[in-house]
Amino acid sequence: FEGPCADVEEAVWYIDKLNAEAGFEAFSFCLDVGHANLYARNLREYIKALGHRLGIMHIHDNDGQTDLHMLPYSYVRNNGKDHIIDWDGFIAGLREIGYRGNICFETFRCMSAFPKDVHPQLLDLICALGRHFVNAITAE
């Protein structure tokens, strides 16, 4: 069930139309990385096409079939050799557009999967992943 703006050209048109009607850059796009993976989107190309319109992201991982909301880098194939989501392409696309917007981890199912007594360590890991993404996106 692809939703509105799953097609990047439609998303660009829609955001540009809304901003033109507003008379200023009032609207931007929220990229749900897990949903893009479910619909086999090339993240790098999708991000590049959005360009400056990309304002925030919901970052999470899945198996390519179900919207699981797990930690980035969680799902691999070929005995751990290949990630299901092209995280390198994702980072490259963000670097190419000079992304400096917000990131949001959508990992609630991951949190519910672990015992409460390890939640502090899990939150530390999520924070470390956030630093990883920021450093990779902004590296010179």
Task: Show where each model-derived region lies.
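Divalent metal-binding pocket/active-site signature
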Residues: F1
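Histidine-acidic metal/acid-base catalytic patches
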Residues: C5-L31, N37-E140
